[in-house]
Amino acid sequence: MVQQKVEVRLKTGLQARPAALFVQEANRFTSDVFLEKDGKKVNAKSIMGLMSLAVSTGTEVTLIAQGEDEQEALEKLAAYVQEEV
């Protein structure tokens, strides 16, 4: 298991389209992927779980991955949320 704290820099946070793209990217990996905010941990492959966190720009979250491709999943997803687009 690997984990990393990251600051979400997406202009709209993880809302609507960015959240859908994040979930789509997370589903490309075989590892289990989770996102944690303020002690609430959700499956990052679930759009409903991700939306329930209400992650806005500037929010610090913890990405957690466990499985065969955990390191690659963590790196790609961390890079995605840290993009300033």
Curated annotation (Swiss-Prot):
SUPFAM superfamilies xref list: HPr-like
Gene Ontology biological process terms in this record: phosphoenolpyruvate-dependent sugar phosphotransferase system
Keyword terms of this UniProt record: Phosphoprotein
Domain of life: Bacteria
Note: Not phosphorylated by PEP and by enzyme I.
PANTHER family: HPR-LIKE PROTEIN CRH (PTHR33705:SF5), PHOSPHOCARRIER PROTEIN HPR (PTHR33705)
Assembly notes: Mixture of monomers and homodimers. Interacts with CcpA as a monomer.
Biological role: Along with seryl-phosphorylated HPr, phosphorylated Crh is implicated in carbon catabolite repression (CCR) of levanase, inositol dehydrogenase, and beta-xylosidase. Exerts its effect on CCR by interacting with CcpA.
Family named by the database record: Belongs to the HPr family.
Name this protein carries in UniProt: HPr-like protein Crh
Annotated organism of origin: Bacillus subtilis (strain 168)
Record gene name: crh
